[in-house]
Amino acid sequence: MKLLFVNACVNRATSRTLKLARGVIEAMQAQEPFEVTEIVLEEEKIAPLTTESLNARQALEQKGEFDDGVFSYARQFRDADRIVIAAPFWASSYPASLKTYIEHIDIVGVNYLFTEHGPVGLCKADKLTYVTTRGGALPDEADCGYQNIAVLARLYGIEKTECISAAGLDVIGANVDALLSEALEKASRK
């Protein structure tokens, strides 16, 4: 079984989201062993689409040449059995690196198709887990990042999504370690 870990965390040495995500993956591994592939988006330096790169990609799409390297992230995402995305709550959603990554995996013909009956997802994953931390005491429902990822997952054919979060970490007097432990404990019971 292949687990794809999309790591959109920055300041990785001190990232609370990354700490929580590593704990979540460890708990998953205890239940079912996975071959984990981690993509550190900050290191990948994926460029946003431009007129030139989009036109080149669309030309390949029209020819059905999905084996080209430009689609490697999309194929990797499609072929994963389980997906974990770790992204801190920034500007009501997630870091720009994750948005750029999504632009590179959102490919008609690789991760989904449009038919006369609507979209059909092509991804193998049975579940996508979104891991995040928030400084404020906001609920998952207020996290536009998770909501966006959940909608995309359904489009790609991934019916089960979950958000594992720790909130209120920057509230004055918050016990950050306790909040992270509580989130991990709650995730372990799922």
Predicted regions and their residues:
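N-terminal beta1-alpha1-beta2 submodule of the flavodoxin-like/Rossmannoid cofactor-binding fold
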Residues: 1-103, 107, 185-190
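Short, glycine-/small-residue-rich phosphate/pyrophosphate-handling segment
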Residues: 114-156
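Conserved nucleotide-sugar donor-interacting segment of glycosyltransferase catalytic cores
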Residues: 105-117
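Residues at the starts of beta-strands that form the adenosine-phosphate
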Residues: 2, 35, 126-128, 160
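Structured loop/turn residues at beta-strand edges in well-structured enzyme cores
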Residues: 78, 96, 123, 156-159
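Hydrophobic residues at beta-strand termini and immediately following loops
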Residues: 39, 131, 164
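Short histidine/acidic/glycine/proline-rich micro-motifs that form metal-
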Residues: 10-14, 135-139, 170-171
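Glycine-rich phosphate/pyrophosphate-binding loop and the adjoining helix
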Residues: 26, 139-190
